[in-house]
């Protein structure tokens, strides 16, 4: 737990203030990362990941795509930073604020956009209900088939790495 007199809390608070100031002044996320000493990449250290994510979320609050591109261009632990930014801005802009060309490319058979939308609607309805609401789940066999297929691809890559040239 971070307490106000804890030096770690003070460090995080200072970095978050810098993130807010940098976003207000128009610095890009890459420039902000450089400013806090992350010239080469954003590490997975929480005190760097969170301020960069907060900066991108504030600086690019009107453009989900620009925010995501900026944090990925920062380098390093981009999946974590992008997940945080995506969660913050995705909640703010909703499905209509996501880039259409990105959404159109989403495909994780057997879970598709219709499944995700239905699940979201069930979750919203469950907020008004004291009873758990059923949701349609992808068929277990379909998920198992898909996962075995990808496991075989991963294993093939692993075994290929055992063969020359190393």
Language model feature labels by segment:
Residues 1-75:
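Accessory "access/gating" subregions that flank catalytic or transport cores
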Residues 126-166:
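C-terminal domain-closing interface element
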Residues 1-8, 101-114, 134-146:
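A broadly tuned preference for mixed-charge, low-complexity surface segments
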Residues 8-23, 29-40, 88-93, 103-109, ...:
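Short, Lys/Arg-enriched charge-dense amphipathic segments
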Residues 48-134:
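Catalytic phosphate/nucleotide-handling subdomain of diverse soluble enzymes
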């Amino acid at each position: 737990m971070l307490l106000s007199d804890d030096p770690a809390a003070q460090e995080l608070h200072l970095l978050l203030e810098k993130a807010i100031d940098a976003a207000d002044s128009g610095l890009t996320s890459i420039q902000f990362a450089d400013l806090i000493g992350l010239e080469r990449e954003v590490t997975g250290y929480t005190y760097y990941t969170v301020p960069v994510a907060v900066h991108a979320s504030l600086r690019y609050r009107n453009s989900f795509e620009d925010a995501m591109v900026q944090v990925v261009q920062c380098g390093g632990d981009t999946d974590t930073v992008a997940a945080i930014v995506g969660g913050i801005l995705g909640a703010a802009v909703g499905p209509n604020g996501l880039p259409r060309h990105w959404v159109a490319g989403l495909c994780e058979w057997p879970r598709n956009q219709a499944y995700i939308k239905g699940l979201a609607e069930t979750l919203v309805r469950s907020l008004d209900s004291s009873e758990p609401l059923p949701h349609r789940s992808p068929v277990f066999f379909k998920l198992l088939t898909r996962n075995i297929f990808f496991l075989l691809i991963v294993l093939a890559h692993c075994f290929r790495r055992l063969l020359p040239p190393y």
